Amino acid sequence: YRLTGNSNSFDAAASVGVRNQWNIAEGLVINTSAERQALRPFEGAKGDAVAMSVGALYSANPIYKIGGKLEYRTSRPTDQWNGTFAYDRKLDSNWSAIVRDLFLYTHDKWDTGAGDQTQNRFQLGVAYRDLETNKFNALARMEYRTDISTASADPKDSTTSIFSLHGNYHPVRSTTLNGQAAFKYVNETFGNVTSKWQGTLLSGRFTYDFTDRFDASIMASRMWGTGASVSGIGVEVGARLVDNMWLGLSYNKGKYVDTELFSSNASWTGWHLRLNYKFH
């Protein structure tokens, strides 16, 4: 049973299904699933949906790991295809390469004017970790996004390119310096109107660990974009709730921007509560 909500309502879905993991060979795993959902939205018509997926992961080779998943979901109003792909490869003891891709296609069966929605996110990166001292790690990443809609009333064709550098430095165990730099270019067409936007971002964070459970941070950022520039500064105190889970309370002045989503992931002046979990 699942429950999701937003600012003014809740949507519920009762689900039943089966998941299987097939160990084909050493280091090769196939995952399959089938699920039926009874959708019970707070507002709007009720409905049913069926979802099926198949995925594979190959990790027998110590040099690289490759995996992917394809999912199909159908309901009375829409059909959806969702695909993911990941490839990690060790270049040497300190360097590795990363490739990621996420694809989502949605077809509206009821409203022909809604058209089809196609989204794709492609990432290519190179990561460095100093295993000898474990004091410095860095990531250089390129991301290319496409967002296409064939809706008759509001057709859209958008492409976004993001180039970013991320670095973490630990001079001593209790101190962490984090820096990020990014460039973003957006080319969008809505109907017959085309617009372009580009921006540059610099951000940094200084974190001090008082104990293994409590820390404090100071962060700042500056973003320059077409026709505008924003900056922000903030302070945060954090506590480790359980292993790999942290809760942070911060106050920001101005607009603090993170490179993860660039202009979308921004914190305006005020108090903010943040929950982080690190997956292995």
Residue ranges and their predicted role:
Residues 1-280:
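Gram-negative and organellar
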